Amino acid sequence: MDKKYVYEFNEGDETMRELLGGKGANLAGMSKLGMPVPYGFTITTEACNQYYEDNETINDGIKAQIMEYLDLLEKKSGKRLGDEANPLLVSVRSGARASMPGMMDTILNLGMNKTVAETVANLTNNERFAYDSYRRFIQMYSDVVMGLSKKRFEEIIDEVKAERGISDDLDLNAEDMKELVELFKAFYKNELKSEFPEDPKEQLMGAIEAVFRSWNNPRAIYYRKMNDIPSSWGTAVNVQMMVFGNMGNDCGTGVAF
């Protein structure tokens, strides 16, 4: 396949909004300036449109490019998806040409599985952080990729808090987070009649497809109509090393406009 559908952040620049989306173009621009942007890559808006042309399927050529750029990300970061010794975790985010805040989908902590959670707990010496990240990933992936009810996951959390006699999520300890992981997986299996995916590359492709699909979810369609944004633009997808906001009291994440 001659057409380029995937760009490392340092390959693009801020003028390429039509192809890389607003987020991807700005990440590229900041990378070019030498700012400390966590490594990642952008799957273009053209890949999104091709996905719809191919009956909502990511074709083999685009998949091959995604895997090629994942390999580059792993080499740059020194981490690998699913690695038992030094695992890579990524975020998968939408990025349309025009800002559409909250309209499309995001998946965080992708790459988590049973083995990786144990490794992260050991590497950080922080079991609570590791299993909190894992349960958040299961919850988000189940909702965004598989369409399960967000409400039921929140109810499960409330049930565990009630059993423990606490009211704040911050008071849930590492053992509570481990219990939530198992309860979330059980709900997933009961609803979908299959196990939660352990293979990080399967997780990644599922998440990318979900972001492409979110371009045409009802709230995104409504937002585009209200703001005169053409449906033909499509959305880019940004895959980037995770930055954690839940590792402790000395870290956080936010959005600046």
Segments from the language model and where they lie:
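Nucleotide/phosphate-binding sheet-loop regions of phosphoryl- and nucleotidyl-transfer enzymes
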Residues: M1-F257
